[in-house]
From Swiss-Prot:
The gene is shop. Disulfide bonds: none annotated. Disruption phenotype: RNAi-mediated knockdown in larvae results in reduced levels of sulfite oxidase activity. RNAi-mediated knockdown in ensheathing glial cells results in larval locamotion defects, including reduced run phases with more stops and an increase in head bending frequency. RNAi-mediated knockdown in the cortex glia, astrocytes or neurons has no effect on locomotion or head bending frequency. Pathway: Energy metabolism; sulfur metabolism. Its cofactor is heme b; Mo-molybdopterin. Its main location: mitochondrion. Residues 200-423 are annotated as: Moco domain. This is Sulfite oxidase, mitochondrial. Residues 190-199 are annotated as: Hinge. It holds the Pfam family Oxidored_molyb. Binds 1 heme b (iron(II)-protoporphyrin IX) group non-covalently per subunit. Binds 1 Mo-molybdopterin (Mo-MPT) cofactor per subunit. It comes from Drosophila melanogaster.
């Protein structure tokens, strides 16, 4: 893409499409030494963007942070760019926004890269650059829960990370970012993101065409919900995919798993893990943001817009973690944690990480395994090949894929995903008052259920003989709690009907797999005449936890733990 310097009125005509057709080019300062040289890193597809990569990576956190902060900063946004201008459509507005950072703002001063670098603390004001723009994000940092990470990006460029964290490259984020602009950057060269970063997405695996992406880079997708209730074990190729970074390429012959924190450290190979006694467990894995799209209807939240399909049920096989840790001399201690790290690395070689209590890891009834098989087949790359830790009954975020390191530690993982993500809050907590350090990381998920068929808006034929409609779905509760009942109503709770359950017979506390259910609901003559029926479903687990009725009562700014009644409107024919 060539540098564009038309007037703002010209920008509003949205003629940028010809420059966006094939790929994005990024603008980097010459003072950063942008020479296109590549440096390979072990276990990673990244190339180094420069000597300040440690700082540059955290620019990605505040790129994501801009999305998080959009809601609390909406009233503070600077709309001066669009004053007096009229945008013909939302598409043209977005077209304009995507040119802001490559356009000189003549009314603003110009700064050299050396000047920007000096603004690297709250005291000196925190400046960052994107393309031709210089931005002062000090006020944002002081209020944002991930401010300590954002601070590490101070005085540097965020350009490389827009090509990686593309889910944040939205109109809202671009508009918010431009509101922080204070000037133009002097002395730029044009660089292709693939040349600069080694195209970390070039070796992504093939996916089934039926998976519906919530984001493409990183790839996150769920199957059509209508397919979920058809089989007790979710087919591997239709199991939802949740990735936070590019999928790593791992040679199984070179694979090693480091284990630390016992009497002595140990390294296991893939063959070494497979030589250990094999154990299998049926377990559902559910993303913490499953059904977030329903919660968003109450009020906007931050996160991928998952439907009810970010869950799957599988038979996982591998070595038991409790056996491995005990062989290492690890003793029970309810105050300790087990940290897991994957091979999916960010540009600074920081891995995805998470942790669980040591008590869960050492409990044979906890069934935590180092899995190398999924439904009797080798793990696919999207699902963690060659080894994924499976923590039954626990939120998907703790089931770390591409496992490379296990550490028994006194504290939880300090990773972003353990400390500043996957946590719940009060409906009254907003981005002005949130404090991630005061909320526990999600472990066991709450009881939930979903209607898989019929789907919203479907035309459903009533059984002529008995006047019923058939409804199918899934139910699950974290912590190994059994689903004891699924109730359905099609008259807003006046009458309830109990579904028939299909589930694995397991001892109490070890019901890690989901339950599929089927119900036949009577349709009254009045409902037939009205033509529309709304079906509600709620599940009850063995602790008699019940789904809440409304999302208004459990809304949280991250959109996690979305387990209110599942409601589907259909047309009766």
């Amino acid at each position: 893409m060539r540098l564009l310097r038309p007037s703002w009125a010209g920008l509003l005509r949205g003629r940028h499409h010809q420059h966006q057709r094939h790929h994005r080019r990024l603008l980097l300062t010459t003072s950063r030494g942008s020479n296109g040289e590549r440096e390979e890193q072990q276990h990673s597809q990244w190339s180094s963007p420069g000597s300040r990569s440690e700082q540059l990576f955290y620019a990605a956190f505040w790129a994501g942070g801009l999305t998080l902060g959009y809601h609390w900063l909406t009233d503070k946004k600077n709309h001066v760019l669009l004053e007096g201008q009229k945008v013909a459509s939302e598409e043209e507005l977005e077209a304009t926004a995507r040119l802001w950072h490559v356009t000189n703002r003549r009314e603003l001063p110009t700064y050299r890269a050396e000047e920007v670098e000096q603004h690297n603390s709250v005291e000196k004001r925190i400046w960052v650059t994107y393309g031709l723009g210089v931005y002062d994000v000090t006020d944002f940092v002081e209020n944002h829960p991930g401010g300590d990470k954002i601070l590490m990006a101070a005085g540097s460029a965020i350009d490389p990370f827009w090509g990686i964290y593309q889910q944040h490259n939205t109109l809202e984020v671009l508009e918010l970012l431009e509101g922080f602009r204070i000037g133009n950057l002097e002395g730029l060269v044009v660089t292709n993101v693939d040349d600069e970063l080694g195209s970390p997405w070039s070796q992504e695996p093939q996916r089934h065409a039926l998976l519906k992406p919530a984001s493409k880079r990183p790839f996150n997708a769920e199957p059509p919900i209508g397919l979920l209730a058809e089989q007790f074990y979710t087919p591997n190729e239709l199991f939802y995919v949740r990735n936070h970074l590019p999928v790593p390429v791992i040679n199984p012959e070179d694979y090693e798993l480091e284990i630390e924190g016992g009497a002595k450290d140990k390294t296991l190979t893939l063959d070494g893990i497979k030589a250990l006694p094999k154990h299998s467990v049926t377990a559902a894995i559910m993303c913490g943001g499953n059904r977030r799209s329903e919660m968003t209807k109450v009020k906007a939240v931050k996160g991928l817009s998952w439907g009810a399909g970010a869950v799957g049920n599988a038979k996982w096989s591998g070595a038991r973690l409790c056996d491995i840790l005990r062989e290492q001399g690890v003793q029970p201690d309810e105050t300790k944690h087990v940290i897991f790290e994957g091979a999916d690395l960010d540009p600074t070689s920081h891995p995805y990480g998470a942790s669980i209590p040591l008590a869960k890891a050492l409990d044979p009834r906890g069934d935590v395994i180092l899995a190398y098989e999924m439904n009797d087949e080798p793990l696919s790359r999207d699902h963690g090949f060659p080894i994924r830790v499976i923590v039954p009954g626990t939120v998907g975020a703790r089931n770390v894929k591409w496992l490379t390191r296990i550490v028994v530690a006194d504290k939880e993982s300090d990773s972003h995903w353990q400390q500043n993500d996957y946590k719940g809050f009060s409906p009254s907590t907003d981005w002005d008052t949130v404090d991630f350090s005061k909320s526990d990381a999600i472990q066991a998920m709450p009881v939930t259920s979903a209607i898989c068929t019929p789907q919203p808006g479907a035309r459903v034929k009533v059984d002529d003989d008995e006047g019923h409609i058939t409804v199918r779905g899934y139910a699950w509760s974290g912590g190994g709690r059994k689903i004891v009942r699924v109730d359905l109503t099609n008259d807003e709770g006046v009458s309830w009907h109990v579904a028939e359950l299909e589930q694995e017979e397991m001892p109490d506390g070890r019901h890690y797999g989901w339950s599929l259910w089927t119900a036949r609901l009577p349709v009254s003559e009045a409902q037939r005449r009205a033509g529309d029926v709304e079906i509600w479903a709620k599940a009850v687990d063995s602790a008699y936890n019940v789904q809440p009725e409304k999302f208004e009562h459990i809304w949280n700014l991250r959109g996690v733990l979305a387990n209110a009644y599942h409601k589907v409107k259909v047309k009766i024919i």
